[in-house]
Amino acid sequence: MALVRHHHGFKRYAFSVCYDGLKCLGFSFQGAHENCITANGTDLRAVHSVEGKIRAALSALVDGYGRRKNSPWKSNECMDGSNFENFQVSSRTDRSVHALKNTFHLDIRMKDIQLSWEPQKLVRGLNFHLIRNARDETAKILQDCHGALPANLMRSPENDVRIIACKPAPLELLPNKHYNDGPPSSRSQPSHIAWNARFTATSRTYVYRILVHRLPIPQAHNDDADNSSHTSSQMEEYGFPFEAGRSWRIHCQNNFDLQAMTEAANKLTGTHDFTSFRGKGCYRSNPVTSIESIGIQATPFLSSFAFLRNEHDHNNHNNSNNNAEIITVAIKGNAFLYRQVRNLVGCLAHVGQGKTKPGEVESILLARDRSKAPQMAPAHGLYLVDVEHGDFNI
């Protein structure tokens, strides 16, 4: 297998990034399907992928060396940047999935044979252009719409993506830990690689937030019975407006059975064939992955706010009027199949509600059949909180 190298005159950098998944079309760049009105009428103006936003900021900073363009940016124009290449993320998150820390690498052309970009200048410059690009685009849309703000701009896009840190990537070639995935005849990976955000990641940690509440859900008035805006999911947001798009809200009269969930989680920990928990369209040839740990914790809703924790825990932990709690499911593993984490959480939530017994989880796992497992948890409750690269910290 050939070695993967970056071109002469380019230097590889490793970045960490955080983002609000609600405001983005997932991580991966989607070309002409971003910042547009789709064929079915969906208004995606000013809506981009995380990668699309970063590429546009790179285009303004690196290709133009900071020169501001006269016309508003469009992400589908920034794929041809001649001064950066080989953009690779460690974890390609879906639309509405948040990240407290994801990592990626790219190769940036050196200013001359001896002068490369300083990491801190890249961080400051990219964040500057991420904000300015969003402002310019919003202003252009407002001008075109004569001041009428489209629904997708109700949430400001200026603060949805931020570069956290940047470092020059290690120079040495590394063994590719995915080289032995699958039979030799189907191997498409090189045996050794330059530092790569995806293939050198040693662990990924996700946290899923579930809001379990017992508040009565108001019913739509008769006059609004035919109003499609009164959907059950919207009515369930009643009483918890700050959790909209931040957690999976489940209305349940009884507390989740954490002991049963933990018992089920123990059966999922370790190295297994997770075919029953892989998403449709998963391209990975080998469904075997390793889960290092699954931690489950419940916290009264008000106690999830740190400044209220001590007082609320003392006065209200056993109070029957405490109508909600946050359940967090933390899953750490070396790699995951497409939508594996959300499928695992959906199964654990079923167990917590008593709809599936802990002992049945092992049978679901051994069945290697996605149809045997419960429904997948929604995307907006999922957070990628950390990606580790061995001894190399970003």
Predicted regions and their residues:
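Structured-RNA-binding interfaces characteristic of tRNA pseudouridine synthases
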Residues: 2-316, 321-394
